[in-house]
């Protein structure tokens, strides 16, 4: 009985020792990127790369009100803002513009690999010459860069198109 009592006391002390040790918690690494435009396929105009406003790195992070300098959210992760290109509603995006914007975005995402999570700021109503599912294509290319271990989350307009390819990635 005395032996069991000593074992229980020893185990309790050991357990308290482990639980009282404060280990520095590793923050998740989260990237930010995106392409956002609402296209009208009825418009005769096209949207080229010059139609997009680009925000990168800290300017991108500062552009979101929920990431204000004094925001608690800003301290909950290691943020790696890459690039978001956004345009006002316009005509279909030229294939050249899409390929260029996508390449620049992916190149910036590669700079800080690996990520635990990735926030993609997309609209969901982009049309690109020669592509049936531009957001799905973009997400697939992003997934090819960040891998399948990274959680990808998107925000999009309420009427955005969620294709199977987009949802799968």
Please give the residue ranges for each predicted region.
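Bacterial N-terminal signal peptides that target proteins for export
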Residues: 1-8
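Bacterial Sec-dependent signal peptides at the C-terminal "C-region" and cleavage site
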Residues: 12-26
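N-terminal amphipathic/basic leader segments beginning at the initiator methionine
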Residues: 25-72
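Active-site histidine-anchored catalytic micro-motif
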Residues: 31, 36-38, 95-102, 110-169
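Surface-exposed loop and adjacent secondary-structure segments within mature catalytic domains
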Residues: 37, 48-50, 75-77, 81-84, ...
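Glycine-/proline-rich flexible loop or hinge segments
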Residues: 51-57, 83-92, 123-124
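A structural motif corresponding to the C-terminal end of an alpha-helix
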Residues: 68-80, 145-148
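Low-complexity, highly charged intrinsically disordered N-terminal segments
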Residues: 74-80, 84-97, 101-108
